[in-house]
Amino acid sequence: MNAPHPASAALTQTLAARPTLAELEARDAFAERHIGPSPDEQAAMLATLGYASRAALIDAVIPPAIRRQDGMPLGEFTQPLTEEAALAKLRGIAGQNRVVRSLIGQGYYGTHTPGVILRNILENPAWYTAYTPYQPEISQGRLEAMLNFQQMVMDLTAMDIANASMLDEATAAAEAMTLLQRVGKHPSNVFFVADDVLPQTLDVVRTRAEPIGVQVVTGPAADAAKHNAFGVLLQYPGTGGALLGGLSTYQALTDAVHAAGGLVVAAADLLALTLLAAPGEWGADVVIGNTQRFGVPFGFGGPHAGYMAVRDAFKRSMPGRLVGVTVDAQGNPAYRLALQTREQHIRREKATSNICTAQVLLGVMASMYAVYHGPQGLKRIAQRVHRLTATLAAGLRQIGYTLEAGAFFDTLTVATGPRTANLHIAAQAHGFNLRQIDDGRLGVSLDETVTRAEVVALWEIFAHAAHAGAPDFDQVEAGIADAFPASLARQSAYLTHPVFNAHHSEHEMLRYLRSLADKDLALDRTMIPLGSCTMKLNATAEMLPVTWPEFANIHPFAPADQTVGYREMIDQLEQMLCAATGYAAVSLQPNAGSQGEYAGLLIIHAYHASRGESHRDVCLIPSSAHGTNPASAQMAGMKVVVVACDERGNVDLADLEKKAAEHSANLAAIMITYPSTHGVFEEGVKRVCEIVHSHGGQVYVDGANMNAMVGTAAPGHFGGDVSHLNLHKTFCIPHGGGGPGVGPVAVGAHLAPFLPGRAASGEDASQNIGAVSAAPFGSASILPISWMYIAMMGAAGLTAATEAAILSANYVARRLSPYYPVLYTGAHGLVAHECILDIRPLQKESGISNEDIAKRLMDFGFHAPTMSFPVPGTLMIEPTESEPKVELDRFIDAMIAIRGEVDQVISGAFDREDNPLKHAPHTAQVVMADDWSHRYTREQAAYPVASLRTRKYWPPVGRADNVYGDRNLFCACVPMSEYAQD
């Protein structure tokens, strides 16, 4: 037998050594891009912890009793798709949607998003990956943008103070109702809603009113003062377009309500307010609404930034975030979140609201729309919309149709009689969605995107149905006058601050946006190790579909045959989330985690009521819980009973047994977070569920920490009945600097009939809890982000991400434990996906606080960890799975260097008051000033580690003075003179 030729043998060896095609294709896996540490880096991290494999670590961290063994089947998405394949699949699904010109109105309007805003805000990770600006010194850019939003709302509504966005108009109305009940002196429990208020707003108000004993009464706006109500809600203009009359009509109406002891909420269209007298000018006490038409697409209902503005007397009762102006350590103006002591994470069940995340990114877009167009530009847009609407109205009258309102802004209600259904169909056939109000009326709402040709096309549709001819556009338009009383025309100035009058060219706008982004720290610059926040990668491929027209340009009340793709994507995402949680059903309607919590508790309440046990109203909440838990329980009409935690941070089972037995007859639920808020997997979680179930209660598992469980444990399997998820944490929707968020509620099969629904859509609402958000699917246009993430990761990738998150947290904890005590650990001295460093012993010895360390981290180019939650005087760190080892090590090295500085304070090498920690952060202005009086060097201040010489972030302001800011509350744009240098 002949020996093989040497060349042939070499070829065989070469072929055997080369990777297979399958191996080459596997290297394009998205999971490898999403998970930061490489396999080799993970091995090194595991070696630091003393574990041979990731599986061995997970076995030691997660209690065996709750480990899932099914591999988390995801159906067709069990195997991951590449980025390209996932985008192609989703593009095919989106293609089933049909983009039609929607003139439905009902609070949602077509709008042109200026390209400079689309590209440099909505599509810019410097804006969308930032967190809520709790650390003001590294958030000055978005704080300024949020202050612009507040100024815009205050000016247009003529109110004293506005907050930095609400979740949507409907929840803003519900919050306004409870605000009026808190601040008013009226003994009544009646809240009057005018019958021309948006239907979805009425739905949400009714949902919010029922558990707190408020009676909602509806009727004509003119009857508002006749019902002995503590509060009245008016729509301005009404849903059907009507204005009630002149300025005196509105003033007389509010005067009558005030004389009866009530207060008035106006739901106002901001674009209309550029032409119409502002609600603050005719006596409204609170003004709410939506800013969607200021450059934010329909998005099938969201996300959009709602707003609320109030009279000065009510500012401390206003929900949501509030940006104020203070001074920094050098006396320069600085922005910060003001009046934080009224928020849920501090006030708990006594908070003004449970709202946490709002809609900052969308609020920034809306404010920049106003900055870009300025007051004159906005007025021109409004005048054009009104002129076209008045022209359309005159033409319809010529054709022979009757309009219900003589005074209007942009919406017409047309009496169409028996032609209604056919007209509705004909309009759709010609590319227009109209609002069918009932069997005899159609609504038409115009917006800035509507053209002259489309007005003519509408005339032709209506004329054909009436067997008449369409009028001539130029002839009709030539005779048009304003379609509202002259006395209602706005006389007051608005948007007079220079910021709204200086950035109207694209170059100016582009550079302004860049200057703001440069002031901030977001994930595009550095890791954000905030505990309980899961600041993970928001991959570009996940973000791309958000602005596709097939997702962006769909009205939330478009006909079902135009939203087939949306429904398919939503159905698939719901199934994915059911698989991840172990529950039977999911609703994606809640547009924030706080709303998901609230919905979950309402579901529990409805379930008990369906069994004749509506008296069950006690909610057990561990003392370590996030503040939204007790705030949500209070909103749901439940009584909060606190359960103690033991010295290891776990629920005290003995105290739980005692409290559950004590309240057995009235026990509705327990709210627990898992892994716990203390960052550990409690061994006794199944026992907690058993105890509560044995006393007839339901188990609410807060899903804020789901990033530690996906693929490894499922709340629906270990005893949970209901959970909310934070898609803006676990499933990669970005935080947007404080919103948007999505807070789906997931339930067991026995609770599925009670998931949120809405009467406005005609759905059977006999069992569901009603609507908790304005749109049927909440913030629908950002749901593709989570769909993409899950589709690209697959079951194994999602599980690997969870394991990597746990590995990274334990790596950080282990490396920092010689320098800072890790407050809580579980079995084997390990943590879950986050760890809490106890700074209190160091503070006692050195005088250096957790705030000093947080501010000093800014000099190192890092966002601080979570401060003083859930334990005062601590720092909670959550690195997530997405940070590479080099970034983890950079953060660890910074923390070790800071500990070295603390030691120098203790030893006396640094003065206890004049040291780099007490004066952090250090601005470039301070470091480069001629005068340097500190007892440490400029280099120690600015470059505490050598790596900063090639990667230096300069905080734009020094430490913000919180006390000054709250004592001298100022929540409007700062006069430019304040920035003048002496």
Curated annotation (Swiss-Prot):
InterPro entries assigned: GcvP, GDC-P_C, GDC-P_N, GDC_P, PyrdxlP-dep_Trfase, PyrdxlP-dep_Trfase_major, PyrdxlP-dep_Trfase_small
Cofactor: pyridoxal 5'-phosphate
CDD domains: GDC-P (cd00613)
Residues annotated with N6-(pyridoxal phosphate)lysine modification: K729
Pfam families xrefs: GcvP2_C, GDC-P
MF terms (GO), sorted A to Z: glycine binding; glycine dehydrogenase (decarboxylating) activity; pyridoxal phosphate binding
Reactions it catalyzes: N(6)-[(R)-lipoyl]-L-lysyl-[glycine-cleavage complex H protein] + glycine + H(+) = N(6)-[(R)-S(8)-aminomethyldihydrolipoyl]-L-lysyl-[glycine-cleavage complex H protein] + CO2
Record-level GO cellular component terms: cytosol; glycine cleavage complex
EC number in record: 1.4.4.2
Keyword list, A-Z: Oxidoreductase, Pyridoxal phosphate
Self-association and partners: The glycine cleavage system is composed of four proteins: P, T, L and H.
NCBIfam families in alphabetical order: gcvP, PRK04366.1
Family: Belongs to the GcvP family.
Function: The glycine cleavage system catalyzes the degradation of glycine. The P protein binds the alpha-amino group of glycine through its pyridoxal phosphate cofactor; CO(2) is released and the remaining methylamine moiety is then transferred to the lipoamide cofactor of the H protein.
Name assigned to this protein: Glycine dehydrogenase (decarboxylating)
Organism, as annotated: Ralstonia nicotianae (strain ATCC BAA-1114 / GMI1000) (Ralstonia solanacearum)
Lineage, highest ranks first: Bacteria, Pseudomonadati, Pseudomonadota, Betaproteobacteria, Burkholderiales
